[in-house]
From Swiss-Prot:
It comes from the Archaea. Pfam families: Lactamase_B_2 (PF12706). Belongs to the UPF0282 family. This is UPF0282 protein PF0593. InterPro entries: Metallo-B-lactamas, RibonucZ/Hydroxyglut_hydro, UPF0173_UPF0282_UlaG_hydrolase, UPF0282_hydrls.
Amino acid sequence: MKIIPIASESLGVRSLAVFVKVGKRGILIDPGAALGPKRYSLSPANSEMAALQLARSKIQEFAKKADVITISHYHYDHHTPFFEGIYESSSPEIAKELYSGKILLIKHPTQNINASQKRRAHEFLKNVEGIAKKIEYGDSKTFDFGDFKIEFSPPVPHGREGSKLGFVVMVLIDDGKKSVIHASDTQLINEKAVKWIIEKNPDLLIAGGPPTYLTHRVGNVRDIGRELINRIINETNAELIIDHHIVRDKGYEEFFNSLDKRPLTFAEFLGRENAPLEAYRKELHEFEKGKDVELPKGIVKFLKELGEQK
């Protein structure tokens, strides 16, 4: 089994897209990427837009290698919609190319879902039903592909218990030699999700971390997240990759270092330096105006790479 992180906050965009290769088969998990329309009351910087285009090209590239696509929920940073979206780098043509001929294993569109995601799921299915090879609802089900199995968790909260953001499904891929769980936007701050992860005891856990940049809205997720992630560290043998919401906070390193075992980000797993562009949106706008600002070296390096690709 080969695991390739594609896009995430440590790589400059909102995403948790991953490609898994098992033998000759490819599985693409949560193929979406987006930018926060507003952060610090600012629209995305030009460098964020460039990073989104890079993420989009990678998602499309890996989609060509995928037989199966899984979707944990219907937020646009986790699936690609069929509309022209500047902050999603989406269009009907892009979405059609992505999903055509694929086996889609997706979150149930009408059960354990909030109103917003139900509308999005309806629009998604309306467009994808004529082009996908097969569509199955994954919630609590296991799919046997011969040399590997894909198992879905029951629906769990998107964040804390009672979250207004609805529910997500986690996905476990097991080839008999190695297993990986993609825990999506559970944020590792609800008991139900963490209990399922511990029960399955994967070799690798990929998850979005607590949204510590939103404590003014969601409460003290820092302490809850630390407690529950430490439980996973101490009660499983899993290697941890944690990214997404937590890396929107400039203090993500401090949070990581407070855990019993420091996880990796997508960038670090790939041997790269972190480039959390959204967290530094203020500074990026100043930098793009030609002002002298201090940026993390990982961002400076990433910006140089983006410039070289133009």
